[in-house]
Amino acid sequence: MVSAGMNGMTMPRRFGGLNFSITPYTMCAEIVAAKDAAFGNIWSLQDCIETLYEFGNEDQHSRFIPRVCAGETMSMDLTEPDAGSDLQRVMLKATYSEEEGCWLLNGVKRFITNGDADIHLVLARSEEGTTDGR
């Protein structure tokens, strides 16, 4: 996929993408899934790059999107032991450490598709006392 330039098909060229619309991407995803459904799942269903592009900031875009376009893998870490796939019940806590300049995670995720990925997009709660989706 990487040697064919398929990673980051819909991402802007400035990040190493092809800047294609969603239609050719969907066609490619269908072809890949027809040959190997498991690989199609990892390549397209877990397409975290779209989520990162839509909701990430410029720093995150420049740090992570070129890496994915170059062939590094991503996973979307959502499922927890007591929440299953009910994302409203996610309890993993994210706390920003001024001292370390990064987010610290406290909790458990499980059943992560592509869990050995290079980059992880993790769903966590960062506001004390929240239970709703934000």
Model-derived regions: residue spans:
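Active-site proximal loops enriched in glycine and acidic residues that flank catalytic Cys/His/Asp
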Residues: 13, 43, 68, 77-80, ...
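Internal maturation/activation junctions in enzymes
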Residues: 3, 44-45, 56-92, 96, ...
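Short secondary-structure boundary/capping segments
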Residues: 24-27, 57, 91-93, 120-122
